Amino acid sequence: TLFPYTTLFRSVINKPRTDYKGRIFCYVLDDEHYVIGGPVNNGGVILRWLRDEILASEVETAKRLGVDPYDVLTQIASRVKPGAEGLIFHPYLAGERAPLWNADARGSFFGLTLSHKKEHMIRAALEGVLYNLYTVYLALIEVMNETPNTIKATGGFAKSEIWRQMMADIFDTNLIVPESYESSCLGACVLGLKAIGEIDDFSIIEKMVGTTNAHQPNEDTVAIYQELVKIFINISRSITESYSEIA
């Protein structure tokens, strides 16, 4: 899983598989492997939107103090319990690719009440990004007909221990993140080595990745998220036709 401004969720398999519902894709990696998965538009870009539009004053203070604005963002989110007290965010601020494939999709908060504050909106937004990615994961499981026991993630989001644990809980799966957060370049180098015959297989990656951070799902939090994910999916389905009307 990669978390740049957009986000990718993929798995490597030995035989090609097709999603007849058109939610995810499958393509050749090499002579013996295929990649299956899907990209979403709304990953790290949601954090940037929160930073620039919701937390502008806090960000200015953070800059003066020499603090990473994204650390401030996730710390504010950590003040709120998992589930953001019933607030759900659909993160479709830039339309959406997998699994909706709908350029007209729009973002929304659902469940907003007078008791919700800025920190609830931030937590709900972070959770919403992962809820959406989880729907890609569900499609992947359906097509592969198996459930991975571990997810390996990389990208800017991986710097946040709070968001990493959030992902482990929402996906109810062990999460491993390399300390070298930006691993796309490393992966490209390894593919190049394999292509020119310098290595026989991809097992060398384990040594090259180095130290990793591991997170296990919290059983109580998993139960909360499983209920909210159902609501997230149901809402998205119920308003799909309205996206084109408001776009």
Name each region found by the language model.
Residues 1-8:
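Short, small-residue-biased leader/transition segments that mark boundaries at the very start
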